[in-house]
A protein has these predicted regions:
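An N-terminal, well-structured beta->alpha segment
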Residues: 1-55, 59-62, 68, 86-87, ...
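Short glycine-rich phosphate-binding loop at a beta-alpha junction
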Residues: 36-43, 67, 170-172, 271-277, ...
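N-terminal small/polar loop signature for handling phosphorylated ligands or for N-terminal nucleophile
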Residues: 39-101, 186-246
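Glycine-rich phosphate-binding loop of actin/hexokinase-like ATP-binding domains
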Residues: 89, 102-118, 240-269, 276, ...
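Gly/Ser/Thr-enriched, mixed-charge loops and adjacent short helices
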Residues: 99-224
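Phosphate-binding and adjacent anionic-ligand microenvironments
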Residues: 271-427, 434, 438-454
Length: 454
């Protein structure tokens, strides 16, 4: 049984993710940590209070006092964990639909647990023998009101506040009713920006849009950018560890292009950057142009962060890393994804020229993403096997770090099972959208026929 996927553990609440399960995961984590205190945060989902209570109970049962941060972005919990030297539990399902929730586990250094540490927690969970404290040694709760404010203050100290303020930028923000609604608008006002918002009230129903910040869900933000003559649009996912952008014309910017621009601004010869197996050719080209190395990992922030730490221990400089979904990591700041920090770093790029001009060198790439759903583990296995057969029969170079990626020279396609949802994700990229669409559609059609038993 694998409990933790590419970004923690998630599921539909009361079906796959129950309060009892959350309690047991928290107790297992507390047993492995052996910590006197643990930080606990959540996003805006309706089931957040229920599951946070379950997590607090599990932690208290093994003797840990619980610092309840309330609704905070995941990077705010990570900053608190790092500052206080305590591990943390974040109740969030990030970009998943409202019926989902989940858990991310954070170490006392503020970094998501490594694969090795997650496996230790998973073993403790499956052993079902938590280190329960005596009745008079169980943990207590305390409410921490200052976590969001302190997080914003630390952000302000970490970016070029003067340059951003001097640029007199108008910023349109769509926090998507998530945790970022309570931090990002105020942060960018404190940076001296004229802030306009949409979907900026916390609401676990996510009435304005789904939490995932993809183009299909962000039409309101594009409209707001155009209506307010904003310099840039910024969108977050449910826990605000990602940032996706619109340019000054209200046009959606691919996350891969943003990652390439941010990397191009900081990479130097001899540096290393890290991304996942679905990396865009944009980042490959940027790394080559800067004489920097690019290392690939299986998909998921945990895998990328683990590799960053390994590289840094080996003496390598990793100034930037991340994925094309808006999850960018600047290890010199923190080894975590932070949507607000990423957005501020992007603002630094547009203080003297428009966003469209900044992104122009990274045009000419088309990305397509599809999902193929499966009903059970048997169907999942069929889809994965079929993807492998398709990949090895194609006229291209096959990579099997995570799923099956086929590089054709002018394009690539990847199929891999999601670590958080019952779907096989299909990614494709080419210089022409028709080529990328054709590759994705051909593979999806093959998978769907296999799932139907054809």
């Amino acid at each position: 049984m694998q409990v933790f996927g590419s970004s923690g553990t998630r599921g539909r609440v009361t079906e796959e993710l129950t309060p009892d399960f959350v309690l047991r995961v928290a107790a297992a984590a507390g047993t492995v940590w052996g910590a006197d205190r643990v930080a606990l945060g959540r996003d805006t989902r309706l089931t957040g209070p229920m599951l946070a209570n379950a997590a607090a109970s599990g932690l208290a049962s093994v003797g840990a006092d619980v610092d309840r941060l309330g609704i905070v972005p995941t990077p705010a919990l990570q900053a608190y964990a790092d500052r206080e030297g305590v591990p943390g539990v974040m109740v969030t399902a990030s970009h998943n639909p409202p019926a989902y929730n989940g858990i991310k586990l954070v170490g006392a250094d503020g970094v998501e647990l490594s694969v090795e540490r997650l496996e230790a927690v998973e073993s403790a969970l499956l052993d079902d023998d938590p280190a329960h404290a005596a009745w008079d040694r169980t943990g207590t709760d305390r409410t921490v009101e200052s976590a969001r404010r302190t997080y914003r203050e630390e952000l302000l100290e970490a970016v070029d506040r003067e340059a951003i303020a001097a640029a007199d930028l108008t910023v349109a923000i769509d926090p998507g009713h998530g945790a970022g609604a309570l931090t990002s608008p105020e942060f960018f006002r404190e940076l001296g920006c004229d802030v306009r918002t949409v979907n900026a009230h916390p609401d676990g129903h996510f009435p304005g849009r789904d939490p995932e910040p993809v183009a299909a869900n962000l039409q309101d933000l594009g409209t707001l950018v155009r209506a307010t003559d904003a310099d840039v649009g910024i969108a977050h996912d449910g826990d605000a560890d990602r940032a996706i952008f619109f340019d000054e014309a209200g046009s959606y910017i691919e996350g891969d292009a943003t990652l390439a621009a941010l990397a191009d601004a900081v990479l130097e010869a001899g540096d290393t950057t890290v991304s996942a197996v679905n990396v865009s050719q944009r980042l490959v080209d940027v790394a080559d142009a800067n004489d920097a190395a690019l290392e690939l990992t299986p998909i998921g922030s945990t895998r990328i962060m683990t590799r960053i730490r390994e590289l840094e221990r080996a003496g390598k400089r990793v100034p930037v890393a991340g994925e094309g979904n808006g999850g960018v990591i600047f290890p010199d700041y923190r080894i975590n994804r932070d949507g607000a920090y990423t957005a501020a770093r992007f603002l630094e790029l547009i203080v003297d020229r428009p966003a469209s001009e900044v992104l122009e060198p990274y045009d000419g790439y088309a990305n397509v993403r599809r999902n193929v759903e499966y009903a059970d583990e048997a169907e999942r296995a069929t889809l994965v096997e079929t993807a492998g057969e398709w990949a090895h029969s194609a006229d291209g170079e096959v990579t099997t770090i995570d799923g099956y990626r086929v590089d054709f020279g002018d394009a690539w396609v990847l199929a891999r099972p999601s670590g958080t949802e019952p779907v096989v994700r299909v990614y494709a990229e080419a210089h022409e959208r028709d080529r990328a669409t054709d590759l994705a559609d051909r593979l999806v059609e093959t998978l769907e026929r296999a799932a139907a038993g054809e």
